[in-house]
Amino acid sequence: MMIFMAIAGYGLSVCAEEDQAIPYSATAIIPENQLNKNVSYFDLLVSKGEKQIVTIQINNSSNKKIKIKITPNTAKTTRNGTIDYSGMDLKNTDNLKYQFDKLVSKEQVVSIEPHTKKNVDFVLSIPREEFPGIILGGFYIREEKDEQQVESLNKTVQITNEFSMVIGCQLRMNEEKVPKDFQLNKVKLGTYGGYFSIISSISNVSPSLVSFYSVEKTIQDMNRKEIAKFKKEGISIAPNSIYEAPDKIEANKLNPGKYKMLLTIESRDKKNKWRLSEDFEITSKEKKGVQNEAIPSTKISNRKIIYLVTCIWFGLVILLLMILLLRKRRNRDR
């Protein structure tokens, strides 16, 4: 379970099981050069060549001593169209000049006594050259368990929650907005969640954050006949990052041959649109390889049939039991 105090939506999102207490919390100590004082993440106006200390306060609300690992990471974009600050193996664009994790001191592991607070300092080394837009990253915070704790958890059958938190950090040298710019790099077959899919590689090549945009895609054959259409809402893309956007599609709709992907990106306020296109080709070898990896459609329908038959069978058993009980009651009454 992860708690976000990040920038991908400009808010705080918390999800937790009601019966489980969160063992610790983390708070950004807001400095004087914070631009937006109403948010719980770092939004810093910085000057070139300076060094700055940023502080995160960890509060151990549990009854035991804990170790907390805090790792600075550069913001990237997941296949779901969300911002990731946890250090997942995702791609940034080639024109990303400064990675957040390279500008911050190394990750730290700190021990905190029960029911106490501890301040953890990180040093930001701001680039000597002025940069446009924003540099975006975050501090990924999670509990570090020792070997004994891990072994103990492995021996238990129960499912346990692992809590983690993210505090976002946005660096900028001015408040000027940078024009957004996108590129459609490559379109290829692949799998998503085990299903046969078409994957479009979309680059946000500007140092600006994309929040809650819509992405519409249309696949055409070379005769401009529409093969498939997709639309996703609420897409967020980190600055200078690549969004590998997957869409599930039936394999029989994409036979080997040449196609065109038409893509429209629209801003949240509907005021700006970007139209991109890319020709792509599907080979027999590529399609066969992806089909071998994907869940066969026959297997999916068989599962549905088994589920339906099982439900009907249980329904008939319950109905039969009810009839037998009613007959017994009638016999007793007689």
Sequence positions of predicted segments:
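Beta-sheet-dominated interaction scaffolds and their linkers
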Residues: 28-62, 66, 109, 181-193
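Short, solvent-exposed loop/turn segments enriched in Ser/Thr/Gly
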Residues: 38, 49-55, 117-120, 132-138, ...
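C-terminal membrane-anchoring or membrane-association module
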Residues: 310-334
